[in-house]
Amino acid sequence: MDIVDIRSKTSDELRELLASLRKELVDAVLNRKIDKSGNHFYCVNIKRDIARVLTVLNERKKEERHV
């Protein structure tokens, strides 16, 4: 997921996306532990997407404080 796509979403949409990404990460980790053949980088990419979403949400929160 691109940062441009993330920045174009509203804060509510980002919170929903964050929740779904966290669920997806849990599922991916569990599947990886069960199968032992899962792709490690898939989990890494989900974690990076979560970090991007959290970064944008925190930036918006800081902007609200300063306005």
UniProtKB/Swiss-Prot annotation:
Any one annotated GO CC term: ribonucleoprotein complex
Gene3D superfamilies: 1.10.287.310
Domain of life of the organism encoding this protein: Bacteria
Pfam families attached to this UniProt entry: Ribosomal_L29
Swiss-Prot/TrEMBL keywords: Ribonucleoprotein, Ribosomal protein
GO biological process: translation
A molecular-function term among this protein's GO annotations: structural constituent of ribosome
Family to which the UniProt record says this protein belongs: Belongs to the universal ribosomal protein uL29 family.
Protein name: Large ribosomal subunit protein uL29
Lineage, highest ranks first: Bacteria, Pseudomonadati, Pseudomonadota, Alphaproteobacteria, Rickettsiales
Protein's gene: rpmC
